[in-house]
Amino acid sequence: MSKQTIERLYAAFARLDGHEMQACYAANARFEDEVFQLEGAREIGAMWRMLCEAVSAQPETRGHWKLATRDITDRSAHWDANYIFSTTGRPVFNRIDAEFTFDKRGLILQHRDRFDFWAWSRQALGVPGWLLGWTPMLRNKVRSQARANLRRFLEKR
């Protein structure tokens, strides 16, 4: 059942369906990656909806959106995302390794995505990413900005 939940999650992501993605998480789920640390299906779902809406919002960014998954097991997956980073308009190719734990109903209880933040920041941010992407300072700035964006997104709903 857990492998099917992972497949359902990424199929919804490929369609940019953040609501369906949220339905894959338990109410008390936790999500963590290099940018976000979230608790609860509401927050996690809002993050996915915010990201999906950012891609869907403009035809030029929608045309660059590609998601590929592979090596899906009942506890992990590898996925690659091609997209335009909406803040800078720069193209990004990000390789992510995901690890999951599930509740008894097969819903995601913990989701941890790992990716090379410096590689991501060089693509997404350009020169600032090249120079500072390896530093905690830039990572914390990106986290803070992402958190503020998510807070604004939640306030609108």
Indicate where each model-derived feature is located:
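C-terminal and inter-domain tail/linker signature
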Residues: 1-157
